[in-house]
Amino acid sequence: MAEKLISKIPEGPLSEKWTKHKSQLRVVNPGNKRKLEIIVIGTGLGGASAAASLGELGYNVKVFCISDSPRRAHSIAAQGGINAAKNYQNDNDSVYRLFYETIKGGDYRSREANVYRLAEVSGNIIDQCVAQGVPFAREYGGMLANRSFGGAQVSRTFYARGQTGQQLLLGAYAALNRQIAEGTVKSYPRHEMLDVVLINGEAKGIIARNLVTGEIERFGAHAVVIASGGYGNTYFLSTNAMNSNGSAAWQCYKKGAYFANPCFAQIHPTCIPVHGDQQSKLTLMSESLRNDGRIWVPKKMEDVKKLRNGEIKPNDIKEEDRDYYLERRYPAFGNLVPRDVASRAAKERCDAGFGVNKTGLAVFLDFRTAIERLGVDKIRERYGNLFQMYQKITDTDPYKEPMMIYPAIHYTMGGLWVDYNLQTTIPGLYAIGEANFSDHGGNRLGASALMQGLADGYFILPYTIGDYLATQFKNPKTDTGAPEFEEAEKAVRAKIDRLMSIKGHHTVDELHKKLGHIMWEYVGMARNEAGLKKAIELIQELRKEFWSDVYVAGDKDNFNQELEKALRLADFLEIGELMARDALHRKESCGGHFREEMQTEDGETKRDDEHFMYVAAWEYKGADKEPELHKEPLLYENIKIATRNYKD
């Protein structure tokens, strides 16, 4: 079935591809749009913007979220900003520079055409959000302000203090609410998609569980859009919201949609370190802090020991005895290297014994120099809410002492394979935002997730989905009484009944923690062949334990969070195995995927472009069967492929 990997990338010059492609897409006239139904799964920035835009175009949209309100989507937690090539700072930014730095940051493992389109529409996103009333930070004269993020040598990140995701989501939520009031969008809060329904090989609906009543419901449509985010919670401890999950995308994979580059997971360098065995999630400290914060560890082991024993404070260590290791190793970018580079550097220092907390798994993020240069008031203006959050969690005042940080799982670059139209290998099934694989390659640049979600939802999907729906408006509304719906619902009920009947000895959280330990130990920041094989073996054993000895309390026909978690863990166990399998197959180091066997003498990533310059798209072949690998070659016609260099 390799012929399914047709990317549909348009011919012609890079800068003209998207414009030319739009002109060649089929469209649906307003009268026919009213006959068509679209299901959108997820109400984060991608889902909310897509549902609002599609509703405004006149389609009948059903939008589903697992929370009480779309405002609870995890997009709201994004802190630092959103990238766009506006060149407001007059620092020589451009669409091409954003495109190039995104490709380079992803270690040359993403499609040129998709990334250029993302950079091309980025400016429109800012205009759209300003029109919605998003309160971006402004300079004294009223111009929108920018700051820098990792992997960029210009300032292109627009922000609303440390609450950018919240403000962008409120803008998208307002647009969504307007369409709900108009009647073009119907919202289904507290509903979780448990399966996608295919009729004649095309996506025609979903099976969902009402999380309040436990009722299993059927919903039909002419197309389905997956905007449910990534699968970072496979690791148990991550910066994601605790109910974030990859289940919707995973059900699509098991129905025939290919899953691409699952091993590409991003580990964020600035998170509050783990503090105990009973911790349920981790807290991100925005990358924006690296604009003014300097990362360091002591140079002397004796100072490290004294810090751990509480004999000295960080401020007692003299400037000449501090190792600002990112500034030392990467002088051209300093503390603003890409996330994968900064995370590995922190791990290297801690592995060498220079970690500064009692566990040895922390480094300092210090604002003393910035406070001396700018003053406390300016730092408070830029980062006040982030400093307040840090102090509440750690009881340490970051205005007076350095923050302690350590890398943690944050984002997944892998996801459902999609073509240039954002359609998966299943006709009528689309994936946007973090749910797809398309734009970030092996590593996402900071502030680009919000950019992709809104680009897909506002400015790409509303054009491309019409090309498919132009063939569907003559078809009647999907009959949810069709045998395919009956069969899908029956399978969902059987899975739930099986989980409820086990009555074993282990809670879902116990088993999820075990999975998280396996993933972090063997499929984390550093991977090797023996460890990945061990991970696959351990995950398979754990999956057997889960299906034979898990205990799911409560009633299936009612509100039951244990059942919700069990259904998601069943998927995480399978996702984790595919991640390990993909990482084992990809015998190179690129971006967030670091194989210890493939590194340079100074510990940097070492790609193998001859053998792995492709998207790895995996096809599900059945339970307990190995998936089949399909390859989409990556061609670079506008960028010269090179080893990433952030040193000069």
Please tell me what each predicted stretch does.
Residues 251, 257-392, 463-466:
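An anion/pyrophosphate-binding glycine-rich loop and adjacent beta-alpha core
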Residues 223-278, 282, 440-463:
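Glycine-rich loop(s) and the adjacent beta-strand/alpha-helix scaffold that form part
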Residues 128-215, 220, 227, 271-285:
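Conserved redox-cofactor binding core of oxidoreductases
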Residues 34-36, 214-223, 425:
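Core beta-strand elements of the Rossmann-like FAD/NAD(P) dinucleotide-binding domain
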Residues 67-100, 266-270, 277-281:
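Conserved N-terminal glycine-rich FAD pyrophosphate-binding loop of Rossmann-like flavoproteins
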Residues 102-146:
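Rossmann-like flavin
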Residues 42-45:
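Glycine-rich Rossmann-fold phosphate-binding loop(s) that bind the pyrophosphate
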Residues 7, 20, 25-28, 32-37, ...:
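Glycine- and aromatic-enriched mobile tails/lids
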